[in-house]
Swiss-Prot record:
Organism in which the protein naturally occurs: Clostridium botulinum (strain Alaska E43 / Type E3)
GO molecular function, a single term: tetrahydrodipicolinate N-acetyltransferase activity
Keywords: Acyltransferase, Amino-acid biosynthesis, Diaminopimelate biosynthesis, Lysine biosynthesis, Repeat, Transferase
This protein's name: 2,3,4,5-tetrahydropyridine-2,6-dicarboxylate N-acetyltransferase
Transmembrane portions of the chain: none
Broad class of enzyme this protein falls into: transferase
Catalytic activity: (S)-2,3,4,5-tetrahydrodipicolinate + acetyl-CoA + H2O = L-2-acetamido-6-oxoheptanedioate + CoA
Length: 236
């Protein structure tokens, strides 16, 4: 079944209709050589096993064989999760440990996603764009090429409450740390958002905005460009 992930109602339907998952990993000290484990993924022999699968299936194996188990340890990081994490193996970008990126996200070539960043379903990250530490890109947020989204900054999602217009950030935009781009706002190419700003209205191309709510304070000039220069070496 296909879904139009540019429509918040379609994303909601996708989440509703997705099979919810509570995967677990269990380390077992015990004899499971005769256990029935066809419905899960497992590894091991000679008294030590690792079981990976849905919690109810793994729990049944543990309970059915509890008389043969000396010890076990269970690891679990989600409950009734509707959307898996993005498969990073095919992404031509640098993704650092601790980034949380849901499935159905598009990440461009040579982009960088730093530790603690969160990127929600339907988001699009352009080539060479950096999403810095602890930044958040909500559902359907769109960042162009060579954007820098500063540490702790937020590009609001448009899933709940539903909105047809996502946040859109043009090419070569720099968004300072801890700024917030509110729902549906568009940032024009080459503009700069000062750190800590709250942007509630569209921003034209080539300007600097600051404050809460953010206002235009100047046009981007050579001095601004010098202070907001991106480093290509970080994207290789």
């Amino acid at each position: 079944m296909s879904y139009n992930l540019t429509d918040p109602y379609e994303i909601a339907r996708f989440i509703k209709e997705s099979k919810k998952s509570t995967p677990v990993k269990v380390y077992v000290n015990g004899d499971l050589s005769e256990a029935l484990m066809d419905d899960i993924e497992w590894y091991g022999a000679n008294g030590f096993y690792i079981l990976i699968g849905e919690s109810d299936l793994v729990a049944k194996i543990i309970l059915d064989n509890k008389h043969l188990i000396k010890h076990f340890r269970l690891e679990n990081d989600r409950r009734n999760s509707a959307i898996p994490m993005l498969d990073l193996l095919e992404v031509e970008a640098r993704i650092e440990p601790g980034a949380i990126i849901r499935d159905k996200v598009t990440i461009g070539k040579n982009a960088v996603v730093m530790m603690g960043a969160v990127i929600n379903i339907g988001a699009e990250i352009g080539d060479g764009t950096m999403v810095d530490m602890n930044a958040v890109i909500g559902a359907r947020g769109k960042l162009g090429k060579n954007v820098h989204l500063g540490a702790g900054a937020v590009v609001a999602g448009v899933l709940e409450p539903p909105s047809k217009e996502p946040c859109t950030v043009g090419d070569n935009v720099l968004i300072g740390a801890n700024s917030v781009i509110l729902e549906g706002v568009k940032i024009g190419a080459g503009s700069v958002v000062a750190a800590g700003s709250v942007v509630a209205e569209d921003v034209p191309e080539g300007v600097v905005v600051a404050g809460s709510p953010a206002k235009i304070i100047k046009s981007v000039d050579d001095k601004t460009k010098g202070k907001t220069q991106l480093l290509d070496d970080l994207r290789k």
